[in-house]
Regions:
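Non-catalytic, solvent-exposed segments at the cell envelope interface
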Residues: 2-337
Length: 337
């Protein structure tokens, strides 16, 4: 994939999903004694204990989603799974000639429509969605007094025309809101391009989750949650999130798992455009095990152009699935290059 920095793309509304998940984790620690208040939106049988969230990070000007994340919360085990979908993923969801998943919001017109289309293509139920212009990210980080991130490499980038200047040294350091956003926007130095940026997001997400747990005050966390929801497009209600958290609090505890949707990047030999092609076999395995798959995967072939052999070859082969625990990320066991 191309390795560039587009200054208009404010990255990682994935912070939002971690905020919600951290609320749940905080509830693990605090173990409130209040009775569960169950809303209709989160009533599940034991077989339907998985709540799936779609989180979108949008560039308000262009309308493209540079961050697409699915997160599942299992209220039986307390486990949370976060799957990042690369922005260059091939996704034919409308009559538009633009066939990347990051353009689906523009093509379909809303987060709700995007959620429905992605739900049908993946074969899973998506219960909640949240789309956010990431200009609020710096305020979020400053609201928690910064986060400590192990920056994987020296990050130096200048674009005076866009008023973008990034100077971060490799190593563990505390980032305020401004520098955190710079960390998230950077991608020119990763050998693996956008996949490297996605892995760096995992460092950020884990650091933010850790910081929110350190705060440990559910009221303070909900205040940040309100800040986010007041600036986003969402169907998430506070009582729904609290209900999910209370369910998880009754478990013996849970873990957070991070993963990138399995597939491979490939350049079109016609247009020269880079795409990321999902592996059908690998996605089916992952969705079945962690996101409560309910329908067949990609019944309408939205994730592949069957007329392009190189795309179809990737789509039909098994690609590696790498899943990281929070501890592995904390211990620098993720190789970012």
């Amino acid at each position: 994939m191309k390795k560039d920095v587009n200054s208009s793309n404010l990255i990682t509304v994935g912070t939002v999903i971690i905020l919600m998940l951290a609320l749940i984790i905080a509830l693990f620690v605090i173990k409130p004694q209040a009775q569960e208040s169950v809303t209709d939106a989160v009533k599940r049988t034991n077989e339907q204990a998985v709540n799936n969230f779609l989180v979108l990070g949008r560039d308000a000007a262009a309308g493209l989603c540079d961050v697409i994340m699915l997160a599942s919360v299992n209220t039986n085990s307390g486990d949370v799974n976060i799957m990042q979908i690369p922005r260059d993923t091939y996704f034919d969801c409308s009559a538009s000639t633009y066939k990347k998943v990051n353009g689906a919001y523009n093509s379909l017109g809303s987060a709700e429509a995007f959620s429905q289309s992605l739900s049908e293509a993946l074969g899973i139920r998506i219960d909640y969605y949240l789309s956010l212009d990431l200009s609020v990210v710096a305020k979020m980080i400053d609201a928690v007094d910064g986060i400590e991130v192990n920056v994987p490499l020296n990050m130096d980038y200048e674009d005076p025309a866009q008023n973008l200047f990034i100077y971060l040294k490799a190593g563990k350091q505390k980032l305020d809101g401004k520098r955190a956003v710079e960390f998230l926007r950077y991608r020119s130095g990763y050998v693996t391009g956008d996949l490297g940026r996605i892995d760096a997001q995992k460092l950020f997400l884990n650091a933010f989750a850790k910081r929110l747990v350190e705060i440990g005050n559910p009221l303070s966390l909900f205040n940040v949650f309100k800040l986010i929801c007041n600036n986003g497009e969402t169907n998430i209600k506070e009582q729904d999130l609290l209900s999910i958290g209370l369910k998880c609090a009754k478990t013996k505890g849970g873990r957070i798992f991070y993963m990138t949707a399995p597939g491979e990047a490939i350049q079109s030999n016609v247009s020269g455009v880079w795409y990321y092609i999902l592996s059908k076999q690998s996605m089916v395995k992952l969705l079945n095990e962690r996101f409560l798959m309910q329908e067949s995967f990609d019944k309408q072939n939205k994730f592949v152009d069957k007329n392009v052999k190189s795309f179809y070859d990737i789509y039909n082969k098994f690609c590696d699935i790498r899943i990281y625990t929070a501890d592995e990320i904390e211990n620098n066991e993720i190789n970012i290059n």
